[in-house]
Amino acid sequence: MVRRLVSDWLSPFGQPRFRKPQQWACNLRPETSSETASDLPVQLREGIARSQAALLRQQNFEDGYWCCELRADTTLESDTIMLYNFLGRGNSPKVPRLARFIFDAQLPDGGWPIYKNGPAEISATVKAYWALKFAGYSPEHPSLAKAREKIDELGGIHKVNTYSKFYMALFGLYDWKGVPSIPPEIMVFPNWFYFNIYEISSWTRAIVVPLSIIWSERPKIDCPAQARLDELFPDSRRYAPLRETLPDKGFFSWTNFFLLWDKMLKTAEGRGPHWLRLWALRLAEDWILTRLKGSDGLGAIFPGIVNTIMALKCLGYSDHDPRLREQLRLLEDLEIDRGDKLEMEPCHSPVWDTAISLIALADSGLDRKHPAMVNAAQWLLSKEIRRAGDWRIKNTEGPIGGWAFEFNNEFYPDIDDTAMVMLALRHVDLDENLTLRREKACLRGLHWLLSMQSRNGGWAAFDKDNTKQIFCKIPFADHNAMIDPPTADITGRVL
């Protein structure tokens, strides 16, 4: 099939069939841009022109890309405050600004949501409450009193997710008995084994591998008296057994199977064999350090960066180690200055933003030879990934190619961005040299996309055949994104 598609793509002489890129672009889109612009109402034409001008003003014209703000929920600001206290930097001048952002995002009912206009969510609310206490807010403050009422209404502190319990346990606020086990020995499982780290989603790997190091070391961080959460515990019990916090699926269920394993792991913890633990820790450390090369942090995402910082500290890295300092710098790069407030981004989105901006400008009638268009196309071509990443584990014969979402994320090109970039590049008129370069890059991208199709016919975000639902039954899978199955929207864009 690949050969047939390639032969359709190229002429018999091996050169791109479409010498004039606008011919191909017209085949891929309705011919509505400049051809019919004169038929549009004056107000609409003026509105389009203003929108084009506004979009062009936002371009980084020196390099050619667009990168707009990527908004998330307040768990990012809460986790950043937690991290500063983990590092002994709780008096950072950034903490009050982060806290102000969290404070202003509180809902009228006292809680905090995880998406815009959404309802209060228990983990986000507990994290926000804790972060505000770290920042010096009194538990008697009316907003915190209201938050406590909402926490009780949502089921109480024991209903928070695994990662929230994990962070609280680091400060001695939650008993490790109530935190699901994430042993580093998961790194020892070979890739052919049914349960291995490449059967979970790429973003979960970026979170779990560093957490496995932290779980093994379990440092006890002194919690400031002002940040203790005694008032959130209804009794003296500092944890809830996992069986109480997970939905009941009956005695014979995968959930209970994994709960049994969790109990066995906790019983065996600290009893050896110690060489296996040391080996697993070394594998986890090497895995992380390898994926920091050519990337803006582990997975180039906020949770990966935060957990990597804590994992490196647990392994004894000094504050002056260049690898640790680089992760702290990358975390600072995710800051959005809001004056007296500080917001955090989950990651940067330049490749996606540039691709959709090109398509919007071209389809709205901007000259396809416009310098801004050409500059953006060149930047996208420079961001093509030319090394094998984690996807290679389950796609052993696929060619190298594709694009990632962020500025630098060489181990994790994604299918959605690759498809969008290939569409965008067809919307720009380039000179002969750039056209040839584009054809080669798009051909590599096509090969890669075809090789990433899952057995069920669809395409996922980062991996192929990442569909083992059993992983969603693991106790620490409560973030509801444990696997990376094909989806309709990504498959549609690929097609």
Tell me what each language-model feature is.
Residues 2-495:
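Preference for long, amphipathic alpha-helical scaffolds in soluble/luminal domains
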